Amino acid sequence: MLKNNPKYYDAHWMPYSGNREFKANPRMIVSAKDTYFTDDKGRKIFDGLSGLWTCGAGHSRPEIIEAVSKQIETLDYSPAFQFGHEKSFELANKIIEFTPKDLDRVFFTCSGSEAVDSSLKIARAYWRHKGKVGKTRLIGRIKGYHGVNFGGISVGGIGPNREMFGQGIEADHLSSTLLPENIFSKGQPKVGDYLADDLLNKILLHGASNIAAVIVEPMAGSAGVFPPPIGYLKRLRKICDSNDILLIFDEVITAFGRMGAKTGGEAFGVTPDIMTFAKQVSNGSQPLGGVVVKKNIYETFMDTKAPNYLVELFHGYTYSAHPVGCAASIASLDILQNDNLIERVKKMSPIFEKELHSLKGLQYVSDIRNYGLAGGITIESAKNEPALRPYQIAMKCWDKGFYVRYGGDTIQLGLPFIVSEQEIKDVVGAISDSIKELQ
């Protein structure tokens, strides 16, 4: 079917998209290299979100292409149930070079959403193995994003992700860390560590003996880039420790460099009991995610009197530890190390912060937040037209040759780790011009 036939676009129900708007005005990407997409009109489009927080090392890296090509010729698929292949063990050992030393057992999934649901199941099953069968309740956070499977939307705190899908799993939510007194903060906000004490209220309400785990993003990304207030995560860690509650960090966005550290936990000086990852692990080139747990959690599952040929965790996916995804991820993590890209994020972050906050004072800009190479710009809503202005800004940026994400009332940036100073200035300039054009 010819692409200029309107029916060409009907068959694909696109995710997280205004399908009606897109199909009336398609924006097609045909190739990508380094920090740029190319659209079907031949225009170069700067990638201001690293794909979807995925491609920090840049697009079409030859090292990853070679690894994927070689792997698919050698072993295109291997069952992960009861059998193994070399690349999965190699990748697991590579991943724990990036995680805090106490996190050293890796369970593979195919996406961040699957990683989150896996982490929740592991947390609940852990307490059953410990004989504390009442510890089933899960605590998330308002404005938290933990993927789109039923576990993730249950602990997540973004209304539109939940309201159409009915009853999820048993969960409660901490207060958001977004406070009006912290507007236009640079890096971590100074006010708000006390918000961790909201967990004490949940403990009073439900009882610590009924709570399995708390799950938070070290830096909330998809809701609009909310770095944690100084001391907040350490306070949350202390409360969890005092009440025998597992702490899960959802690091699908923050792991592997985005914060200028190996993980978000490292950036903020806190080690969780369980950590999820995806996105940057493969540089977006192949679907792969996973969960990393502390050794004592893994050993609790292994400490059984059942015969050793029986399954310890009844969970997994057809494509868990897919050999091609593992090969891509090994190459991706090698690039981060060999090219010193995490150090480069540290170097470029102050430049990004300065340029991003230059937007303060523009009409409609009500807040700006940043950490590492992640930034969020809150735009005042037009009366009775929620999200209209961010959508208009994003489309104007696209027309100028820049891809930025709009979500709710926020323009989001997740710059490539290889971004240049001029590219930072250019993308912020495009946003500035696009905002001014609304006036």
Where are these predicted regions, by residue range?
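Conserved N-terminal phosphate-binding loop of PLP-dependent enzymes in the Aspartate aminotransferase
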Residues: 1-439
